[in-house]
Each structure stands twice: as structure tokens, then as C-alpha cells.
Amino acid sequence: MSNTEERCDLSSSRDCPERHEHLLQRVTARAAEIGGGITVSRLMPSRQRRMIGAWCFLDHAGPAEFEPGGGLAVGPHPHIGLQTFTWMIQGEALHRDSLGNVQVIRPGQVNLMTAGHGIAHTEESLPDERHAHAAQLWIALPYEQRDIAPAFDHHPDLPRWQEQGVTFTLLAGALAGRQAPCRLYSPLLGADLACHDASTLQLTLDPHFEYGLLPLEGGLEVGGEHFAVNELAYLGDGRDGLQLQLDPGARVLLLGGAPFGAEIFMWWNFVGHSKGEIARAQKAWEEGDARFGRLDALEGPRLSAPPIPWKIDAE
């Protein structure tokens, strides 16, 4: 679940309004196709909200049903300057990358791929799979770590507990005295909140974090406003607690993080701290450069990068 769009605009983290304490903002999704006929709801980046902490990309895929042999099919494509983060809710998918990793991700598991200097990978549904429901996110790497060696980690066992009528699964960071196993480079939080019956939930927050709440199923009410599936509730920093009302059968993705101080640029499947970093990565990918690892380990035709939409000599 990556960016396969042929027309890509350059995105800067400073393109949208500054965060404000106690802000409550509704961010609406747009449809994007990612391969294999799978359409996702893309929440970030958008003109309304570029980032939540270091979280800089958010797709909600599904719930989708398809014929066997269909589903997710994203060919070899590159990344730099980020970590990809996949939370699988329903269905199974196969990850392959240019480091030689081959890994099936199943419901309740997380795949975390650190691109750093450069990596390439593929994503596809298993042959007999008929369902897909997942959240795909990117995490921008800080300037000091933007060029680290690539890596891949699979996390099948995550902290899970029940509280206030809600089942919590901790995906990233720390919450309620628990710590997720994911290796991160910025202060972040990710959690899945699911309930059977309608629930009122009191959350303890870090006032130094900004937050987002995305209903993946059902809906929620916060600050007197109701948010449906694929409506992201963005909350500025400055809160030490929050009360939520969850609809019956709701599932909500909770994201948080310390505001990302540096400006980053996003274009196609690249994150850079300058446009020059992105332009160099695009050129290296089109030339089949060894920067992106063993491309012969990946099956299928490579995705071609769109032309750079700005003047390279103006860097």
C-alpha cells in the first residue's frame, strides 16, 4: 500500500496551517488507487493536514472483498527517508523487499520497514485471499537518521488489553504503562481501539503530543462533534486528557506524536529534507542504481517514477 499515482504533486510539511492548542479539525479523505484495483481512503498528506508528529502518510484500505487471485498487487517500488508501517486488520498479504525479506502479514500484526538511504519492496494479497482491511502509514525520519541503513521488522505479538469496555492494541510507542516493540526514531503513539457495545472512554494524553483519531469502523464523538469512517479528527497539542464516545462496533486508530520541527518534502514514494534529496533518489531509481538493494529479488515490473515536477537546476 504505497503511492502508485502517476501524477504526484510535491508536498511540504509546512503547506497547511500551524497546529494550535486544543484545536479540533475534521480532515476528509480522498480516494486513491494503489494497485490490483484496490482503492484506499487517503487522509494524509492533504491540504488540511500534512503530519501528526512524524506520521506523514495515512491510507485506510478496505474493508474490501475480491475474487481469489485479485486484491492487492503493488509492483517493485522504492522508498527513502521514511519508515512504512502496516497494521493488518483483515486478510493476509505478502511483503518482499530488496534486502531479501519475505514475510506474510496477518490480522493483528505490524510490518515496519525502515527505508533510510533506500529500499524497494512489493506488496500483494495471497493467492487464495479474498479480503483486505488495513491501515498503511509512513513515518518521516529525522534529519540525523534520514540516511540510515534500511531494515525490516515484523511484529506478530503486540500489547493487547481491555479497559473501559474497549480492547486496546498498542501498535507504536507507549500507552497505559505498556510499550510497543517497534523501533522508532521520533516520539510517537499508535493504537487500535475496538469495542462491541457503545462505550465512553477517558484517555490520558501527553500535552506535548498532537493527536489524530480515525474511525476505521463505526464512528466516534469527540468535542461535541461526530466523526464517521474515514473522517480524521485532528487534535492539536496541549491536552492532558480526552473523553470519547465510541459507537457500537467502532474501531478507531489513535495516532500521536511530538510535533515534527523540521520541514520535510514528500513526493511519490520519497520523503526528503530537501527537494534535491528527492530528485537524486528519483534519478537513481530510474537508472536501476544499487542504492535500492537487490532489485532482482523482487518479482514483477518495476513502477516507474513520474517526472520531477520542479526544475532540478533550481535546487
UniProtKB/Swiss-Prot annotation:
One Pfam family in the UniProt entry: Pirin
Residues the record lists as binding a divalent metal cation: H77, H79, H121, E123
Keywords: Dioxygenase, Metal-binding, Oxidoreductase
Enzyme Commission code: 1.13.11.24
Keyword Oxidoreductase in record: yes
Superkingdom, taxonomy of origin: Bacteria
GO molecular function: metal ion binding; quercetin 2,3-dioxygenase activity
Keyword Oxidoreductase: yes
Cofactor requirement: a divalent metal cation
Stated name of the protein: Putative quercetin 2,3-dioxygenase PA1205
Organism field: Pseudomonas aeruginosa (strain ATCC 15692 / DSM 22644 / CIP 104116 / JCM 14847 / LMG 12228 / 1C / PRS 101 / PAO1)
